[in-house]
Amino acid sequence: MTVTPMMAQYLDLKAEYADALLFYRMGDFYEMFFEDAVAAAEALDIALTKRGKHDGADIPMCGVPVHSAEGYLLTLIRKRFRVAVCEQMESPAEAKKRGSKSVVKRDVVRLVTPGTLTEETLLDARRNNYLTSFAQVRDAKALAWTDISTGAFHVMPLTALKLGPELARLAPSELICSESAENDLREVAEDFGIALTGLARAAFDSTSAEQRICDLFGVETLDSYGSFTRAEVAAMGGIIQYLDITQKGKLPLLRPPQRETENRTIQIDAATRRNLELTQALSGGRAGSLLAVIDRTITAAGGRLMSARIASPSRDLETITNRLDAVSFAQDHHDLCGALRDHLRKVPDLDRALSRLSLDRGGPRDMAAIRNGLTQSAILFETLGSHELPPLLADALNDLSRHDNLIDRLDATLVAEPPLLARDGGFIATGFDAELDEARSLRDEGRSVIARMQQEFAALTGITSLKIKHNNVLGYFIETTATHAEKMLSPPMSETFIHRQTTANQVRFTTVELSELETKILNAGGRALEIEKRLYETLKSDILACSARIAQTASALAELDLTTALATLATTDGWVRPKVDDSRAFAIENGRHPVVENALRQQSGDPFIANDCDLSAEEDAAQIYLLTGPNMAGKSTYLRQNAIIALLAQMGSFVPASCAHIGLISQLFSRVGASDDLARGRSTFMVEMVETAAILNQADDRALVILDEIGRGTATYDGLSIAWATLEHLHDVNKSRALFATHYHEMTALAGKLPGVENATVTVKEWEGEVIFLHEVKMGAADRSYGVQVAQLAGLPPAVISRARAVLDMLEKGEREGGATQKTLIDDLPLFSVAPAPAPAPAKTSDVEARLAEIHPDELTPKQALELLYQLKEAANP
């Protein structure tokens, strides 16, 4: 069946991008047809209409305005769609020159995917948007990642077990891989909410990949960037190939690849990141996370660096020391720190502005952002230059300079507040280009220019009544009376004034100068815009030529922001510099949980109860706190706060404590909290066992492990056995530093059997039948769990609480007396019978109790007391 030329063009383009929604530009709208329209209308909640017919059926259609398309794009990307953006490559007028029925040329200019976003409105300014690439060459594996909005480009070798933890660390938006690996990676991608995209195997061919990398960076060999495995080269090459596909050949500005190693940062698995709520709270948002509480950065790049440091605490002692030295310097120089932050507040997002310009998605406002950022950089250079700086800040200082020429050029070229888009014009400063100033003058002041010319012609001819007028037939012309016209028609005036028309009373002339002016006025607006666009392209080239140095400056500004932010945090919240070394120490005095402390401060003003922790261990030995105590007493908070303090220390931050000594930690593991995995048919207990198994199989002697309530999801003796064996394994095999919280009081016996285990408990106090949580950790074991009291605090009905006390008393009595088996005790409890009886009403006071209440022991002689005892015994057992 025949289709219209426009629909034929659409179908041809759609066939090339079958797996994406096609945004087909038609004037001021992007339109979608057929299945794309149905899917987009549902995803965007917009009207589904129809346009024409195909094979006898209506063609579904929907559309979105071009000016607001970014918001719709963001919605589609978040719902895991890929969008092919098809633009008009010529105007309708240009198309008609090829024939009255010619269709406007269109082509896809970009494939929008979750990992290739650059627009400011589509991205979180304080979070990286990573595109990751997994490759395998024989038995070797590698992971590469880039953020094309900032230019970051990294690669690392990988073992199969480390893919999940690395994806958890990076939190990428998209993962690309060979089509043959898609099925193997689908589950892990779904676990982390990552869009998975398969590419042809050729994209990961290491030989062609190496050439693509060399071509991108304009080098003959990769040797200057380091030594890479074939798998690493393949992973990087896959990224470049994918960017070439999605950006239609216009590759972004990427920095040379940085090779990372697995032991560069603390290994933290996904479960631990989730449990500790490092960058995201369990509720799913940023609020309530560690990042939200400690982030004092004031630039977008500084915010991204803060997030990256929390996600990737270092294992390199020199790196940690340099960061701590920088924070100490900023804290010690309070006035300087304040001055630096005042200037940093004026620093825009240089990285993303630069990236948008390189991809032709930027505009004059991005140029102004670079100008303003570099201007503040120069001021910061002067501010810091007079101080003796620690190494990290000295390196940053070196990267703040060397932009004077570009700053001068940008200052001279751009207006103070340019528009967003180059197509609007009005962004080149007056006085920069004489030709542009003339065009603008003609465009904006055409009448006054004509008036001045009229005065000049009147003076030249001596005809004061001479006028310059305009009509749609002649355009601009000089008009005078027939009497005065004779003078202008005769030499020498006739050489200047050219006769155009004679009417009954008037004679009209023109001049070469007036004709040229008319052309200039008519074309002035378009000409001014063309000149601005030409100057824009020249200025963009100048900026991109300095892109490497601008990127270095952006990194230095982010480092300054992070350093001063951490110093400000330390000062305002009373944090101290930790001692970090190669030892096996772990000694914290008056440690606090920063998130809980912040919540208390905001909600009630109550102080956080600080606690000590000493897990310092000898080489090749474990040190474990076995923590007991009631629910709600603060065990989980204590576990988490010590893990967070260790993490903060190794990211290069001060810590919430009065003193801290941390021997380097290689891994951080956490098994805290309960959750099930219904999608995979895993119970809470199964999830707990899987996470515990991962810890026992991977933790080394430099790991810090926190375990909470291992074994609680199964039968009591099963759970106790698992918890007991887990603790022994941590002590004897893993030899880790660990905090192990449990309700199994029987386990406290291990402190006397294993040299590296110490009992600790969270203290409580009973007052008039109620429990008071003191939240203090002291050495020793808890005497009971206070579960019934906690249940009462939670609001269980009084009858339930009363019955629970009775059951607990009977069970504890049976254990003490040892005269009944567990089965006998349970059989005696109506609670466990087939038809349980309701909880009994409180018993009436007995005769014995009544007589006891009347007795005054101090008034009895020994003989009277003995006689009374026999009487009471007889009354109790009639």
Curated annotation (Swiss-Prot):
Amino acids binding ATP: 629-636
Cellular component terms (Gene Ontology): cytosol
Gene Ontology molecular function terms on file: ATP binding; ATP-dependent DNA damage sensor activity; damaged DNA binding; mismatched DNA binding
SUPFAM superfamilies: DNA repair protein MutS, domain I, DNA repair protein MutS, domain II, DNA repair protein MutS, domain III, P-loop containing nucleoside triphosphate hydrolases
Keywords: ATP-binding, DNA damage, DNA repair, DNA-binding, Nucleotide-binding
Alphabetical list of Pfam families matching this protein: MutS_I, MutS_II, MutS_III, MutS_IV, MutS_V
One GO-annotated biological process of the protein: mismatch repair
Database matches in Gene3D superfamilies: 1.10.1420.10, 6.10.140.430, DNA repair protein MutS, domain I (3.40.1170.10), MutS, connector domain (3.30.420.110), P-loop containing nucleotide triphosphate hydrolases (3.40.50.300)
Family: Belongs to the DNA mismatch repair MutS family.
Job of this protein: This protein is involved in the repair of mismatches in DNA. It is possible that it carries out the mismatch recognition step. This protein has a weak ATPase activity.
Protein name: DNA mismatch repair protein MutS
Record organism: Roseobacter denitrificans (strain ATCC 33942 / OCh 114)
Gene: mutS
